[in-house]
Amino acid sequence: MKAAVLREANTPLEIEEVSISKPGPREVLVRPVAAGVCHSDLHFMDGSYPYALPTILGHESAGIVEEVGSDVTYVKKGDHVITCLSAFCGHCDQCITGHLSLCASPEVGRMPEEAPRLHKGDETIHQFLNLSSFAELMLIHEHALVKIREDMPMDRAALIGCSTTTGVGAVFHTAGVEPGSNVAVIGCGGVGLAAINGAAIAGAGMIIAVDMVDSKLELAKSLGATHTIDAGQCDAVGEVKELTQGGCHYTFEAIGLKATTEQAWQMLRPGGAATVIGMIPVGTMVELHGVDFLAEKKIQGSNMGSNRFRVDMPRFVDFYLNGKLHLDQMISKHIKLSEVNEALAALKTGQDARHVIMFDQ
């Protein structure tokens, strides 16, 4: 099969022929139909988050089941599925206490003594975040996918595999945004836009989108933002405090920078909560004024929207088909696998929301 392989940090992906194993007892072979090109992939490409190489990138996909292992009963050949990087074992402490997105059990992968899922001759190709979706086939644990209804368009379904679940889930689960509350979202990429859409679904009052790209701010309005702030033209913190008469109940950082994380904290009203969704580079320290804790302000992280994806993702599919979740506007362009490097380069400019690889092209 063809796959986009990362062999060295800060180098383009190479389209190569890679071999894939047969499904083990609890594994599922999936033929991707669509895969989103996510900004998170860039963090691993540029070395901000070190990863075992070579690897096949990609972690946001939807496809059709091709084959299942002998012990798999949840899906069968022909089922439509969304994949999820936060595969769960189902019996560790995180899983049994309801925190499935924090499961780190190695059993959702193959053990060192087993043959690798992906290889090129004698060379192991490491699987990326339990998935590796920039490939014509995926071999994954049965707990890394969820069945969906067949009338859901696959390119839209792919977005639910990461950006939508991460952004909407941060609003619903991590922060628990309440109706009528004021919200600010810093960064209007795929995840930030999903958080804005989620805040609108949750019934937030004022929803403030903060970015430096006019086209993204306009897109944010179509997804539910009531106000927009161009952070390149003003003091974003001051503007938010003036609009809200003292600060937001909830803020979301969706870029992954020290400065914007600190701004998310500064935009809070007393008692407010800042949720950091963005991937801050390893080794980066964030500075907060300690006295602010006396105002009962809170800051927290969010991993994949604190999801329970087998419950959440089918609901998000229904939200889309019922007109609540707006995914059509999120797709900037459909591309071929061979165009993945151009899509990743476009992400670096910050101009586009999402490129989606379509494997029938």
PLM region descriptions:
Residues 21-35, 46-96, 101, 147-151:
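Glycine-rich beta-strand-centered segment in the early N-terminal region that forms part
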Residues 175-179, 191, 201-202, 212, ...:
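Glycine-rich cofactor phosphate-binding loops and adjacent beta1-alpha1 units
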Residues 9, 213, 280, 305:
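Residues in the short beta-alpha loop(s) of Rossmann-like NAD(P)-binding domains
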